[in-house]
Amino acid sequence: EAEYLKKNKIKFEIVPGVTSAIAVPAYAGIPITHRDNTSSLSIVTGHEDPYKNESSIDWSSLSKSKSIIFLMGTKNLRKNLNKLISNGMSAQTPIAAIQWGTYYKQKTVMGNLKNICSKIKENNIKSPSIIIIGDVCKYRTNLKWFEKKPLFGKKIVVTRARKNSSSLVEKIYENGGEAIEIPTIEIKSIKNKRN
C-alpha cells in the first residue's frame, strides 16, 4: 500500500501496531507460540503473486513448522493445505479459520487439515480472515475470551449528542460490541431574553 501511495505522490504516514497475525489469534484465544507446543512461528501469505513463475514458499520446510499463520488464506486454502499434506504434515493437524478478527462480528471455525474447507464453507467464512495451523489451536477451548464479552456480536446505535456519547461508545467497545454513532440530539444553552 505504501509503495502505491508513493508511486502516486500521495503523502502518507505509517503508524506501527500489532500485526493481525498475532492480534487475531489472541482475540480468538489461540496463543500462536506456547511453551508446551512451539517456540517458533511461520507467517505466510495465503496467495502469492499469480504472475510469479514459481512459488517462493519452501513447502517442505513449512510443513515441518509447528505453528503456521496464513494471511489472506481462504481463497487458496485447499491448494495450500494439499501442499502441506503432500510434504508430510498430518491431515489431522488442528486448524482454525478466523473471519473479522478483533471485531464484534469475529467468527472462528475449528477443524483439521482434512475437514476445515468444508467447515469454512458450512459457516460461510470469507475474507477478511486468517488461518492458524498447529496444536496451539487446541488452547482456544479454554482461552477464548472475546466472544464471552457481554455485548459480543451486538451492533448498538448511540443517539446521544456526540459530545456526550464518548464514554458510552467506549464502554460498548470494551464489552465486545460495535457502536454506531447517529446523534439525533443537539444540546444548546438557552439564552435568557428577559431584562
Name these PLM-found stretches:
Residues 91-92, 149-195:
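Surface-exposed, charge/polar-rich loops and edge strands
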Residues 2-3, 38-40, 44-160, 169:
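A contiguous loop/helix-start segment that scaffolds small-molecule binding in enzyme catalytic cores
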Residues 12-17, 34-35, 70, 97, ...:
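General beta-strand structural signal in soluble alpha/beta enzymes
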Residues 1-48:
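Short glycine-cluster motifs
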